[in-house]
């Protein structure tokens, strides 16, 4: 199963279109700096503003660039079950190693509806699916008991926990045990969740600090807890700055400041407020990502 630091990759744009050259360069940046897996077309990848064709093309491009060096876990979630099936089948056909599927948003299904949604998609494909539990975006939380039921479904292999609740993670790990891998969806809780038995992180912070995020997960997997705690504490000011506005506004801005890609966003996302930009820039300087 997937372990370590898996980056929730941004989607670089140039003049309104996907910047394919920068996308390939970002993949190489991660592979050179120890990232353990690439996750395109998630929340950080602005999947909500991608066309269906762009979504499929980005996943194919990332798979081609990675060339089997690390796993590619494609974002394939939708609030339409049939659309989630289509996206996941297409990702599997393209060679994705797994899929990350956000819980249905806006229509706010019941726990039974969430269960049936994932069951239908899992039965339609042969690649492992990581459930994405982020109630702040979806409007509904997947309860630990529901995840325990889902852990019995073939191909449901893990959950990205972005509830921000350590109690939630404890209950999921307690109820599911080895049947369901748990990944942190909060960069500030990587150490905490891995100390409880989590397998890694699907990370926004890794976009700009891939080496340090990978080192943190490696330390935890080796049970080098003092080292892991030290790295987590070092990352905290940067993590807070990266979430000073809606993700991925700050992280794309940070990558632009680093010269990795443009900071271009698609509406309804807009550039950072000047005061927040100054705070982000200072945090990046303090961490050593920028000079001066």
Per-segment meaning from a language model:
Residues 23, 55, 59, 84, ...:
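A general structural signal for well-ordered alpha-helical segments in protein cores
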Residues 1-7, 11-141, 290:
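Active-site beta->alpha loop and helix N-cap motifs at the rims of alpha/beta catalytic domains
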Residues 133, 155-156, 266-267:
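Glycine-rich phosphate-binding "P-loop"
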Residues 33, 57, 61-66, 90, ...:
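Alpha-helical structural signal in soluble globular domains
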Residues 123-124, 137-243:
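Catalytic alpha/beta core domains of metabolic enzymes, predominantly
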Residues 50-53, 86, 111-114, 142-144, ...:
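Short secondary-structure transition/capping segments
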Residues 4-12, 29, 33-35, 195-198, ...:
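C-terminal alpha-helical cap/extension of soluble enzyme domains
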């Amino acid at each position: 199963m997937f372990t370590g630091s898996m980056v929730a990759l941004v989607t670089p744009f140039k003049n309104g279109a996907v910047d394919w050259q920068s996308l390939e360069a970002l993949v190489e940046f991660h592979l050179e700096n120890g990232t353990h897996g690439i996750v395109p077309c998630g929340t950080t990848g602005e999947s909500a503003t991608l066309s269906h064709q762009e979504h499929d093309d980005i996943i194919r491009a990332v798979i081609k660039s990675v060339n089997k060096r690390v796993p590619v876990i494609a974002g394939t979630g939708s609030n339409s079950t049939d659309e989630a099936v289509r996206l996941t089948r297409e990702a599997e056909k393209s060679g994705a190693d797994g899929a990350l599927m956000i819980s249905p948003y806006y229509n706010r299904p019941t726990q039974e509806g969430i269960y049936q949604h994932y069951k239908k998609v899992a039965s339609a494909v042969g690649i492992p699916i990581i459930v994405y539990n982020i109630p702040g975006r979806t409007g509904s939380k997947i309860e630990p008991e529901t995840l325990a039921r889902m852990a019995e479904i073939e191909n449901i292999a893990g959950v990205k926990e972005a509830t921000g609740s350590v109690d939630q993670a404890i209950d999921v790990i307690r109820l599911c045990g080895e049947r369901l891998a748990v990944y942190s969806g909060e960069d500030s809780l990587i150490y905490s969740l891995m100390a409880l038995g989590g397998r890694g992180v699907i990370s926004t912070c890794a976009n700009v600090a891939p080496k340090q995020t990978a080192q943190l997960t490696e330390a935890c997997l080796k049970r080098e807890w003092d080292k892991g705690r030290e790295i987590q504490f070092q990352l905290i000011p940067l993590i807070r700055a990266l979430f000073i506005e809606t993700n991925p506004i700050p992280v794309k801005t940070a990558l632009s400041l680093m010269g990795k890609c443009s900071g271009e966003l698609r509406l309804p996302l807009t550039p950072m407020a000047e005061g927040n930009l100054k705070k982000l820039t200072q945090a990046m300087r303090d961490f050593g990502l920028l000079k001066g």
